[in-house]
Amino acid sequence: MSLLTEVETPIRNEWGCRCNDSSDPLVVAASIIGILHLILWILDRLFFKCIYRFFKHGLKRGPSTEGVPESMREEYRKEQQNAVDADDSHFVSIEL
């Protein structure tokens, strides 16, 4: 005899999900957490550059430039722009 004949198969009315219309608080909490997780994941994938740049730099635009010569300010701006440009290069385009 093969193993397939030994396995119990569920009857037709047991194929459905048993947690439908459940008032169990654990099921409700798990559903809410799952939905929130999915929403946050989608937002993260859509806006990850903005989000991580915000957490990295905060609301400030950068360090204060009081008392710093203009040449050093320009050098700092170029470094920041190069860092942003380099950040864009981590995407890989694969053409088949």
UniProtKB/Swiss-Prot annotation:
It is a single-pass type III membrane protein. Glycans are attached at N20. A lipid is attached at C50 (S-palmitoyl cysteine). InterPro entries: Flu_M2 (IPR002089). It is found in: Virion membrane; Host apical cell membrane. Residues 60-88 are annotated as: Disordered. It comes from the Viruses. The record marks H37 as: Essential for channel activity, possibly by being protonated during channel activation, and by forming the channel gate and the selective filter. GO terms for biological process: protein complex oligomerization; symbiont genome entry into host cell via pore formation in plasma membrane; symbiont-mediated suppression of host autophagy. Pfam families: Flu_M2 (PF00599). One of its GO terms (molecular function) is proton transmembrane transporter activity. The keyword Phosphoprotein applies. The record marks W41 as: Seems to be involved in pH gating. The modification Phosphoserine is found at S64, S93. Keywords: Disulfide bond, Glycoprotein, Host cell membrane, Host membrane, Host-virus interaction, Hydrogen ion transport, Inhibition of host autophagy by virus, Ion channel, Ion transport, Lipoprotein, Membrane, Palmitate, Phosphoprotein, Signal-anchor, Transmembrane, Transmembrane helix, Transport, Viral ion channel, Virion. The M2 protein from most influenza A strains is inhibited by amantadine and rimantadine, resulting in viral uncoating incapacity. Emergence of amantadine-resistant variants is usually rapid. Residues 44-96 are intravirion. The chain crosses the membrane at residues 23-43. The keyword Transmembrane helix applies. Residues 1-22 are virion surface. Cytoplasmic tail plays an important role in virion assembly and morphogenesis. HAMAP family: INFV_M2. Homotetramer; composed of two disulfide-linked dimers held together by non-covalent interactions. May interact with matrix protein 1. Forms a proton-selective ion channel that is necessary for the efficient release of the viral genome during virus entry. After attaching to the cell surface, the virion enters the cell by endocytosis. Acidification of the endosome triggers M2 ion channel activity. This is Matrix protein 2. The gene is M.
